[in-house]
A protein has these predicted regions:
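Short amphipathic beta-strand starts and helix->beta connectors
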Residues: 59-62, 112-113, 219-223
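Active-site-proximal segment of RNA-dependent polymerases
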Residues: 83-136
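Alpha-helix initiation and N-capping motif
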Residues: 21, 41-45, 83, 87, ...
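Short, flexible, solvent-exposed loop/turn segments with mixed acidic/basic and small polar residues
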Residues: 63-67, 116-119, 226-227
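Glycine/proline-rich, flexible active-site/cofactor-binding loop segments
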Residues: 62-105, 174-192, 199
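Conserved polymerase palm-domain catalytic core
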Residues: 121-231, 235-257
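Non-catalytic, polymerase-adjacent accessory regions of viral genome-replication enzymes
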Residues: 1-65
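N-terminal low-complexity, intrinsically disordered segments
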Residues: 31-48, 93-94, 98-101, 146-159
Length: 257
């Protein structure tokens, strides 16, 4: 959707000034009016409290599995209608506050998989990396930490830091995921992570991956390559081959990822 400058300025101003839960609620309701019009029924403080507190709302998500093209299963966690509406408003706020890295092609307004492919047109060599379990690899602690840094800056006071906790909780869901243990083996653990199925997860994943994009774009520049990322699909391309096993390029990429 197209946003006018007034809406963008107002969202940024309200976000920058908010210090209390009531002010955050007012911001969500302003975003709701932008999305649904003046007749949109505003969220109440009790609704906000209910949806950001997992122990109060134990049915925040419904989980089900779908088949991937590979035949493996992908777990979808669909938020209930109330939480989903809040997440849609929150997602609009994220998109206004944060400017995606130029290398990010997925989940970005005005960009598509075609734009991702155009970056690499004409190059002779293409190297792809698929990030495993993309959304669930991002846990609530990382979301909270990212919200405390620019451009969100929810670390400027104790009250704003508490808002970072609320927003991170609205974005994440506790579920069983795989993590590497100290021996390098994958084990099942329960973590609060970005769920596949929440409206906020795509945008937040780009926000979290901003540092990754900066570092990988830097590697690409040093080796004379093109770099882009479409969601969990990382692509490098070039006119020369630097992708051999044990190459300096691959070693550097592995250190980052």
């Amino acid at each position: 959707m197209e946003l006018d400058k007034k809406h963008i300025k107002s969202i940024r101003t309200l976000f920058g000034k908010m210090k209390t839960k009531d002010e955050f609620l007012a911001l969500l309701n302003y975003a709701k009016v932008i999305l649904y019009g003046e007749k949109a029924i505003p969220f109440s403080i009790s609704q906000l409290n209910y949806h950001y507190t997992p122990k109060a709302n134990r049915k925040r998500y419904i989980q089900f599995a779908i088949k991937k093209k590979s035949g493996a299963e992908r777990i979808i966690s669909a938020p209930n209608n109330g939480l989903k509406e809040i997440q849609k408003c929150l997602n609009l706020i994220f998109q206004i506050i944060h400017t995606p890295n130029p290398a990010a092609m997925g989940f970005v307004n005005g960009k598509s998989i075609v734009d991702n492919a155009k970056v690499h047109v004409g190059n002779h060599y293409v190297y792809n990396i698929d990030l495993k379990d993309f959304f669930p690899s991002i846990d609530q602690a990382r979301v909270w930490g990212r919200l405390r840094n620019a451009p969100f800056n929810l670390n400027e006071s104790q009250k704003r830091s508490e808002l970072a906790n609320i927003i991170a909780s609205l974005c994440c869901h506790e579920m069983e995921v795989e993590r590497l243990d100290d021996s390098g083996s994958f084990v099942k653990v329960v973590k609060s992570v970005l769920p596949q199925g929440a409206p906020t997860s795509p945008t937040m994943s780009n926000i979290i991956c901003e540092r990754l994009d900066i570092r990988l774009a830097g590697v690409a520049k040093r080796f004379g390559l093109k770099y882009s990322r479409y969601a969990d699909d990382i692509t490098f391309s070039s006119m020369h081959n630097v992708y051999q096993k044990e190459s300096d390029f691959l070693k550097e990429v592995e250190r980052i990822i």
